[in-house]
Design a protein with these regions (language model features):
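Cross-family detector of peptidyl-prolyl cis-trans isomerase
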Residues: 1-197
């Protein structure tokens, strides 16, 4: 090809010649160092905020768990705000908001965009697809749902807000799944919005 060297060319050295007052005053090395120092400071601040949120969330759940009701299955639940609606039954179908955490207070998933924003955990793709929405839960015997979640919801009434402490054997068991490690105890915050058909 025209203009292309026959043999590969290797660049061994670059000399930058500063021309003009502004160019001579420009301290690239210092700007480069300061840029990365600022990125490091921002990351450190983000980690501190995340750890403070994690600690506060864990403390809240530890306090709630001490006040919770323990069922014979090992499930614990605490109604944090009592609703005035109908008690849920085994075959109820309900619309709920939920937020699920790992036992250490780390967020796993939520149906509420405002919770994801507070916890700095917004999934932009999920947001773009308008998937931060309440979910429909079928409490019938054959419904596909983790046992502890179903049992916990059956303790509640429409309008209730509650925290469910679900031991691993009533959740995803000894094997876990793609995003939940084996033997993970889970904590759900739920709000029963309404009965559905």
């Amino acid at each position: 090809e025209d203009g292309k060297p026959i043999e590969d060319v290797t660049l061994k050295e670059v000399h930058i010649i500063k021309v003009g007052v502004k160019a001579k005053a420009f301290d690239a090395a210092n700007i480069f160092i300061n840029h990365f120092a600022e990125l490091e400071r921002i990351e450190k601040k983000r980690i501190q905020k995340e750890q403070a949120l994690l600690k506060a969330t864990k403390k809240k759940f530890d306090t709630q768990q001490k006040k919770s009701t323990l069922l014979s299955s090992g499930l614990q639940f605490l109604v944090t705000e009592k609703g005035t609606g109908e008690k849920l039954k085994e075959n109820s179908k309900v619309l709920i908001n939920y937020t699920v955490y790992f036992e250490d207070g780390k967020l796993l998933q939520t149906s509420k965009l405002e919770v994801a924003k507070i916890l700095d955990a917004v999934d932009e793709e999920r947001k773009a697809n308008n998937n931060y929405q309440p979910i429909r839960a079928d409490l019938s015997a054959n419904a596909k749902m983790i046992t502890g979640f179903k049992e916990g919801l059956q303790q509640l009434s429409v309008g209730d807000k509650a925290t469910l402490f679900i031991p691993f054997y009533l959740a995803y068991g000894e094997t876990g799944n793609a995003i939940i490690p084996p033997k993970s105890n889970l904590i759900f915050e739920v709000e029963i919005l309404e009965l559905t058909k």
